[in-house]
C-alpha cells in the first residue's frame, strides 16, 4: 500500500509538471514587438474563422478519447466528450449501415432499409480472477453474433427495428451465467413514431423531431456509468417499455424520457421482463454553448415492489448533473458529474452519492495526438450496517469498464484515482494504457464482485481494511481491414489488504494478484 501511494504521488506530480511546462510554453515571449503583433493578428484571424464556422454551421469536435481525430458533423451543435471511454453506442449501433450507402449498386435505392451483421470472438486468459470463488487459471472463449434490420422513411411516421443476438462462452471452468450466455435472443423489437419537423428547427437549420418508441430496447446514455448496454460484456442490457425523445443529437437542446422494465436474461429460456420493477428517467441536453461546455441535467428512478415478500421493496430517486467540454483557448478538457440518491430501500432510508472528475490534455501539435488524463471517481458505500440509513449507491444499469480493464468493478462503494495515456501512432492503430488505484469508500460495506458476489465480499467490522489494490493496463486496437478489427489487451492487478484478508477468510488462501490477457476480433458485414 505504501508503494502504491508513492506511485500515485509520483504520477500526479508528473501530470502537473507536464501541464506547467505546456503553460509556460504558451506564455514565454521573446520581448519582440513584431512577434507579439504577429501573435495577436494570428489570434484575431483564428477567432474570425471560428465565428465564421459557427455561422456556417460547422463546429470542430475535440479529439475523442481512444478514437480517431475527426470533425463533427456539419451543422451540428453536438460536441463529443474527450473523456476516456464515455461515449454511448450510436443509434442505430455502429455495425449497422443504410443499404443505399454501402456502395453496392444493387442496393442504391434501398434508402429506407438499415441492416447490420457482426460477429465477435474473444479469447481470455484469466489468472486468479477476483470475481471467482476459487483461485485458478481459466481460458474462456466468448462468441457473440448480432443482426439488425430497421425500416425507416418509407412508412413514416412509422418505423420498425428488430435486433438479434446470440452470445455464448466455451472452454471455461465455471458454469454458464447470463453475463456470457444468452442464446438466440431478440434484444430489440420496437416500433417508432417519427415526426421529423414537429418542433421546428434550431438556429443551424436542423429539424427538431419527436420520436416515440414502444417495445424492447437497448441503448446507452450520458457517460454510460448508469445506463449502458455493456458493449464489453458478451450479453446486452435491455428493457421493455416506452421512450419519448424531443429533438435530436444535432440540436442545441434535446430531452429524452423513458419508462422501462428490465428484461431478465434467462440461460435456458426466452428472456422476459421483470414485472415487479420499473426504471424511469429523463435527460436534458443543453448544447447551445457546446464549444465550451455541454450540460446534461438528468433524473433516474427505480421502483420495485416486494413481490409478495420475496424481494426488497425499493423506491430510489436520483437527480444528477453532468458537464463536459474544453477550456477556451486551451487543449484542456474536462468531464464532471455529480449524483445524489434518496428514497427507501428495503425499509431503510436511502442517502447515497457519487461524483466523477476527469481532466485531460491533448497535444494537438504532435502527430500521434497523445492525450494524458487524470480521473477520480467516488461512489458511496454503506457507512454503518447497524444504522437505519443505507448509503450504498444504486448503480442502476451502467457499465463496468473502464472502471477496471479486468471487469472487476461496478460503480458502488469505491474510490478510484486513475492516470491514463492515449495516442494514435497510425490511422488504423489506437493505443491506451493506465495506472489505477482502488479503495473502498466504506470499509464496512462490500466489494461487490469479489468472490462471485457472495458473503465473503464484506467485512461488517471493517477490520479487513479498505485498500482493494492497484493495477496497470495496456490495450491496442488495430483496424485490419474495412470489415475486421482486432484488439489485444493486458492488465496486471496487485491485491490490496482487503482482498487478501477476505480471500484468506473465505478460501483459506490468497495470491499476490491476478493477470488478464485477451485477444478479440470483430467482423462486420459492411464497411
Which residues fall in each region the model found?
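N-terminal periplasmic/intermembrane-space "pro-region" immediately following the signal or transit peptide
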Residues: 2, 6, 13-138, 148-150, ...
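Signature for the C-terminal beta-barrel architecture of outer-membrane proteins
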Residues: 189, 194-209, 225-386, 444, ...
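Outer-membrane beta-barrel "beta-signal"
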Residues: 58, 76, 511-527
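Outer-membrane beta-barrel and related beta-rich outer-membrane complex signature
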Residues: 129-131, 174-176, 226, 269, ...
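Transmembrane beta-strands of outer-membrane beta-barrel pores
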Residues: 121-127, 153-157, 164-170, 216-220, ...
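Extracytoplasmic loops and strand-loop junctions of Gram-negative outer membrane beta-barrel proteins
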Residues: 97-101, 128-133, 172-175, 224-227, ...
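Surface-exposed loop and membrane-interface regions of Gram-negative outer-membrane beta-barrel proteins
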Residues: 125-143, 153-210, 225-228, 341-346, ...
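Extracellular/periplasmic loop regions
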Residues: 66-84, 91-93, 338-341, 348-462, ...
Amino acid at each position: 500500500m505504501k508503494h502504491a501511494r508513492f506511485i500515485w504521488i509520483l504520477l500526479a506530480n508528473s501530470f502537473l509538471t507536464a501541464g506547467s511546462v505546456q503553460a509556460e510554453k504558451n506564455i514565454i515571449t521573446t520581448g519582440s514587438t513584431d512577434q507579439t503583433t504577429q501573435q495577436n493578428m494570428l489570434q484575431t484571424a483564428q477567432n474570425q474563422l471560428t465565428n465564421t464556422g459557427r455561422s456556417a454551421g460547422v463546429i470542430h469536435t475535440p479529439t475523442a478519447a481512444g478514437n480517431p481525430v475527426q470533425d463533427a458533423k456539419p451543422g451540428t451543435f453536438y460536441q463529443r466528450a474527450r473523456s476516456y471511454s464515455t461515449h454511448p453506442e450510436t443509434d442505430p449501433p455502429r455495425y449497422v449501415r443504410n443499404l443505399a450507402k454501402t456502395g453496392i449498386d444493387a442496393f442504391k435505392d434501398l434508402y429506407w432499409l438499415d441492416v447490420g451483421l457482426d460477429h465477435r470472438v474473444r479469447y481470455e486468459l484469466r489468472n486468479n480472477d477476483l470475481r471467482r470463488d476459487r483461485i485458478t487459471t481459466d481460458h474462456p472463449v466468448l462468441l457473440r453474433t448480432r443482426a439488425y434490420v430497421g425500416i425507416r422513411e418509407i412508412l413514416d411516421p412509422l418505423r420498425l427495428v428488430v435486433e438479434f443476438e446470440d452470445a455464448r462462452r466455451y472452454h471455461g471452468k465455471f458454469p454458464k451465467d447470463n453475463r456470457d450466455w444468452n442464446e438466440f435472443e431478440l434484444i430489440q423489437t420496437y416500433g417508432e413514431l417519427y415526426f421529423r419537423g414537429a418542433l421546428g428547427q434550431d438556429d443551424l437549420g436542423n429539424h427538431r423531431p419527436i420520436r416515440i418508441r414502444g417495445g424492447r430496447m437497448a441503448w446507452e446514455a450520458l457517460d454510460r456509468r448508469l445506463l449502458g448496454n455493456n458493449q464489453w460484456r458478451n450479453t446486452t442490457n435491455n428493457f421493455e417499455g416506452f421512450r419519448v425523445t424531443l429533438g435530436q443529437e444535432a440540436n442545441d437542446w434535446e430531452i429524452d424520457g423513458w419508462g422501462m422494465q428490465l428484461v431478465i436474461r434467462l440461460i435456458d429460456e426466452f428472456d422476459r421482463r421483470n414485472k415487479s420493477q420499473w426504471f424511469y428517467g429523463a435527460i436534458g441536453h443543453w448544447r447551445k454553448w457546446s464549444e465550451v461546455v455541454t450540460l446534461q441535467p438528468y433524473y433516474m428512478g427505480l421502483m420495485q415492489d416486494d413481490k409478495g415478500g420475496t424481494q426488497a421493496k425499493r423506491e430510489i430517486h436520483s437527480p444528477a448533473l453532468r458537464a463536459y467540454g474544453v477550456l477556451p483557448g486551451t487543449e484542456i478538457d474536462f468531464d464532471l458529474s455529480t449524483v445524489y440518491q434518496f428514497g427507501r430501500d428495503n425499509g431503510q432510508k436511502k442517502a447515497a452519492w457519487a461524483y466523477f472528475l476527469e481532466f485531460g490534455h491533448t497535444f494537438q501539435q504532435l502527430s500521434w495526438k497523445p492525450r494524458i488524463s487524470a480521473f477520480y471517481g467516488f461512489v458511496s458505500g454503506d457507512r454503518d450496517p447497524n444504522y437505519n440509513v443505507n448509503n450504498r449507491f444504486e448503480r442502476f444499469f451502467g457499465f463496468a469498464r473502464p472502471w477496471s480493464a479486468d471487469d472487476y468493478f461496478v460503480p458502488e462503494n469505491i474510490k478510484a484515482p486513475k492516470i491514463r495515456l492515449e495516442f494514435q501512432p497510425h490511422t488504423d492503430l489506437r493505443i491506451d494504457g493506465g495506472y489505477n488505484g482502488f479503495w473502498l469508500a466504506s470499509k464496512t460495506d462490500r466489494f461487490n464482485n469479489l468472490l462471485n458476489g457472495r458473503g465473503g465480499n464484506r467485512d461488517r467490522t471493517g477490520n479487513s481494511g479498505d485498500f482493494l489494490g492497484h493495477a496497470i493496463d495496456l490495450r491496442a486496437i488495430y483496424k485490419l481491414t474495412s470489415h475486421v478489427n482486432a484488439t489485444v489487451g493486458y492488465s496486471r492487478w496487485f491485491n490490496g489488504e482487503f482482498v487478501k484478508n477476505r480471500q484468506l477468510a473465505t478460501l483459506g488462501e490468497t495470491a499476490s494478484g491476478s493477470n488478464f490477457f485477451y485477444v478479440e476480433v470483430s467482423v462486420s458485414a459492411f464497411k
